[in-house]
């Protein structure tokens, strides 16, 4: 702030008055033509100030909207006298009378656009320094600047709308679950570190040196113990913690709608979850969604979309063409364990520059390149066309339904890479070509997930969801004899290409749980040390049970059309896992470390004094 502006702000402090017995009668978005003639009191922040001759106009803002107020020397000379001091983001209390705006001056884009409040008296509740960016929906401020001044960023109307919608979503979920006789029960934040899954955040114990609590990645074990306890319908809107790499739709701390039910199978859990999402969509956006949601198996999703959370709003599909090109002279096709193709109708007009950009994009997912063919009248244009025989071309036409004007993209290699590269390219093409309709919400279930997935780094099988997921009927022995073939009683709800929630029927047999731990490479002693309390609980009359958890942040991100979950979390971390506003994480004093029995091998640069 310049010295001149600082002096002005300091000078204006003399005008600041206490709130006293003034009380708001309305928010800044409530007043309409029906209130004309009424005396009101509104309070908020100055969005804009405009001097028009003798009149001073101020747009007053709170989290709900704007109201135009007018300082008129004819209506209230005393109120008008000092109005010239008002600046953007000053905090005002206004008493005045509602009157219609002059003819031709109404604003149909505002709920309060037919009226204005002419000021009879007012108070300056506080001044404000000049903000580092404009408090408007359209801002050129970088995200880092906005996060450093988050309390100002949250004043922007879009951000306020995001959090009002988030509140409505939470209230809607609570009402729905309460109607179904669920109990809202809190579970511990300080718990025990367990293997599997993402890294835990550890909290040292001051009273037990060398011992650590872990912040929960989810309330999974505790909600299962509640089922054993007889609390047969549980939910919680709960904060969870995972020490994992950040991205646009992930945070170190996040919120989920956590649900568990006893005496149920998959159908009952999924039906309950569909009803919940239908209610939330109706209560927040006024959108009716059709239930039951479509379903597809994990194998179908990976086969046709390359991902386990397909966006079905547009119809590009992947096709396995391995057999069609098995004998090809193009060696990459001939030798690859899997060759997949994606036909893009009308894509023949793509430029080489666009294709080169897509080629660079798929390299993110381990691909070496991107093969393509343009289908033109009388010819196939492509660097690989000369390697394809007439029989192979005919087989591709039959498999893909190729027509003149199409372009086909190919990927060949290991299934994991092929699916990741083409599956993500599919989404990028949908965005690039404008194939994805706005304001469309495509829900679906993905079912029959693998029970295990192979971890190349650890050279062992790990749980695909978590180690408490029940195998499908008839797959019990496969847990140890053929882990890759074992399927889980698991289900994910997907919305527009995002995993919205995931759940499963749980293991409620102590013997099956022991077998699961053994299949994951946990020896009996380690399993007892880490999960003995759970196994013991399962030996004491555990009912069949299952549940689901929805990512609250991700849900609200999708409902608000926000590009990142950081826009729907009040005080999020950056992608470097820092808080730019509070400067967390931070060093602590040597005394605090001594109290915890901790000695650092390297002293942080910002070590706190004693």
UniProtKB/Swiss-Prot annotation:
The Gene Ontology biological process annotation of the record reads:
aspartyl-tRNA aminoacylation
Catalytic activity from the UniProt record: tRNA(Asx) + L-aspartate + ATP = L-aspartyl-tRNA(Asx) + AMP + diphosphate
Task: Tell me where it resides.
Answer: Cytoplasm
Can you tell which superkingdom this protein's organism belongs to?
Bacteria
- Please tell me where this protein is predominantly located: cytoplasm
Q: Give the enzyme's EC designation.
A: 6.1.1.23
Gene Ontology cellular component terms for the protein in this record: cytoplasm
Is this entry keyworded Aminoacyl-tRNA synthetase? yes
A Gene Ontology molecular function term for this protein is: nucleic acid binding
Q: Keyword annotations for this protein? A: Aminoacyl-tRNA synthetase, ATP-binding, Cytoplasm, Ligase, Nucleotide-binding, Protein biosynthesis
Per UniProt, ATP binds at 242-244, 251, 499, 551-554
State the residue spans of region: Aspartate.
Answer: 220-223
Q: Where are the transmembrane segments?
A: none
The positions annotated for binding L-aspartate are: 196, 242, 465, 506
UniProt site (Important for tRNA non-discrimination)? 52, 104
Q: How does it assemble?
A: Homodimer.
Known role: Aspartyl-tRNA synthetase with relaxed tRNA specificity since it is able to aspartylate not only its cognate tRNA(Asp) but also tRNA(Asn). Reaction proceeds in two steps: L-aspartate is first activated by ATP to form Asp-AMP and then transferred to the acceptor end of tRNA(Asp/Asn).
**What family does the Swiss-Prot or TrEMBL record give for this protein?**
Belongs to the class-II aminoacyl-tRNA synthetase family. Type 1 subfamily.
In Swiss-Prot or TrEMBL terms, this protein is called Aspartate--tRNA(Asp/Asn) ligase
Q: Which organism is it from?
A: Nitratidesulfovibrio vulgaris (strain ATCC 29579 / DSM 644 / CCUG 34227 / NCIMB 8303 / VKM B-1760 / Hildenborough)
């Amino acid at each position: 702030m310049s010295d001149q502006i600082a002096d002005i702000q300091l000078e204006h402090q003399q005008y600041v008055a206490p709130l006293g017995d003034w009380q708001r009668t309305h928010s800044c978005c409530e007043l309409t033509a029906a209130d004309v003639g009424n005396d009101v009191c509104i309070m908020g922040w100055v969005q804009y100030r405009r001097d028009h001759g003798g009149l001073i106009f101020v747009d007053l803002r709170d989290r709900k909207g704007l109201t135009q107020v007018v300082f008129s020397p004819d209506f209230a000379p005393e109120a008008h006298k000092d109005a010239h001091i008002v600046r953007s983001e000053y905090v005002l209390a206004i008493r005045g009378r509602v009157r219609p705006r002059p003819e031709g001056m109404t604003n149909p884009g505002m709920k309060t656009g037919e009226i204005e409040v002419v000021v009879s008296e007012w108070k300056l509740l506080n001044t404000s320094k000049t903000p580092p960016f404009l408090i408007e929906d359209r801002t050129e401020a970088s995200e880092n600047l906005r996060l450093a001044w988050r309390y100002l960023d949250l004043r922007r109307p879009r951000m306020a709308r995001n959090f009002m919608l988030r509140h409505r979503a939470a209230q809607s979920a609570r009402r729905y679950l309460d109607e179904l006789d669920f109990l809202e029960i809190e579970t511990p934040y300080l718990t025990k570190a367990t293997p599997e899954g993402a890294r835990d955040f550890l909290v040292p114990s001051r009273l037990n040196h060398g011992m650590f609590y872990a912040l929960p990645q989810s309330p999974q074990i505790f909600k299962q113990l509640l089922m054993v306890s007889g609390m047969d319908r549980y939910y919680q809107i709960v904060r969870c913690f995972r020490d994992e790499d950040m991205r646009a739709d992930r945070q170190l701390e996040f919120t989920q709608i956590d649900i568990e039910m006893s005496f149920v199978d998959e159908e009952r859990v999924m039906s309950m979850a569909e009803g919940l999402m239908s209610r939330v969509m109706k209560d927040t956006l006024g959108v009716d969604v059709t239930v039951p949601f479509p379903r597809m198996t994990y194998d179908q999703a990976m086969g046709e979309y390359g991902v386990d959370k397909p966006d079905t709003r547009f119809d590009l599909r992947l096709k396995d063409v391995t057999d069609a090109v098995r004998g090809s002279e193009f060696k990459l096709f001939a030798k690859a364990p899997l060759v997949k193709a994606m036909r893009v109708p009308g894509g023949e007009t793509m430029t080489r520059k666009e294709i080169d950009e897509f080629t660079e994009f798929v390299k993110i997912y381990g691909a070496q390149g991107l093969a393509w063919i343009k289908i033109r009248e009388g010819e196939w244009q492509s660097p690989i066309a000369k390697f394809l025989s007439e029989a192979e071309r005919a087989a591709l036409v039959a498999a893909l339904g190729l027509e003149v004007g199409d372009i086909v993209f190919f990927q060949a290699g290991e299934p994991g890479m092929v699916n990741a590269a083409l599956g993500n390219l599919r989404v990028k093409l949908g965005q690039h070509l404008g194939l994805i309709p706005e304001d469309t919400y495509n829900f679906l279930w993905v079912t029959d997930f693998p029970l295990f997935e192979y971890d190349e780094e650890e050279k062992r099988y790990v749980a695909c969801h978590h180690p408490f997921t029940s195998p499908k009927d008839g797959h019990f022995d496969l847990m140890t004899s053929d882990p890759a073939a074992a399927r889980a009683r698991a289900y994910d709800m997907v919305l527009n290409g995002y995993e919205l929630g995931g759940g499963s029927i749980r293991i409620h047999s102590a013997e099956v749980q022991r077998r699961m731990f053994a299949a994951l490479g946990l020896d009996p002693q380690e399993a007892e040390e880490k999960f003995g309390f759970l196994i013991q609980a399962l030996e004491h009359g555990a009912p069949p049970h299952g549940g689901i958890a929805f990512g609250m942040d991700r849900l609200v991100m999708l409902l608000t059309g926000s590009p990142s979950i950081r826009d729907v979390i009040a005080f999020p971390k950056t992608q470097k896992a820092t808080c730019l506003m509070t400067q967390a994480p931070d060093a602590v004093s040597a005394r605090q470390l001594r109290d915890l029995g901790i000695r650092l091998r390297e002293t942080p640069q910002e070590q706190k004094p004693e």
